[in-house]
Amino acid sequence: MIKIEKKDQHVVEVFEGVIRRTLACGKDVLMARFEYEKDSHVPPHRHSYEQVTTVLKGEQKIIIKSEDEEKVIVIKEGDSFVVPSNFEHEQIISEESITIDAWSLTP
């Protein structure tokens, strides 16, 4: 078991107005808290592992693209969503938001 205290969390601004706090990182899983400023943006990207997100505060628009379709969803406080591995996705933040994200690091 590994305990990570708040003072030891790795904190980085991953995009303008988007702060990531690594809450825990194991061999096969990563969990982080994201803090988004109003009107910030996470550009389109993809990764080889699933992502699970729960919104603690605020509202965001999520655009998820597969090879043959594009889905746009709005997520609000209390909502969760899953991005399958290798799906392109981006986030458009309409108001200050906080999420908890987890990734399974083994495809």
Annotate each language-model stretch with its function:
Residues L30-H47:
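Conserved short histidine dyad/triad with adjacent acidic residue
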Residues M1-D28:
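A short, N-terminal "cap"/entry segment at the start of jelly-roll beta-barrel domains
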Residues H41-V42, K61, F81-E90:
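Histidine-centered metal-chelating micro-motifs
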Residues E67-S85:
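Short acidic-glycine-tyrosine-enriched beta hairpin
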Residues S85-P107:
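Ligand-binding loop in jelly-roll beta-barrel domains
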Residues L56-K57, K76, E95:
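A cytosolic small-molecule/anion-sensing beta-strand core signal
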Residues Y49-K65:
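Glycine- and acidic-residue-biased ligand/ion/polar-headgroup-sensing regions
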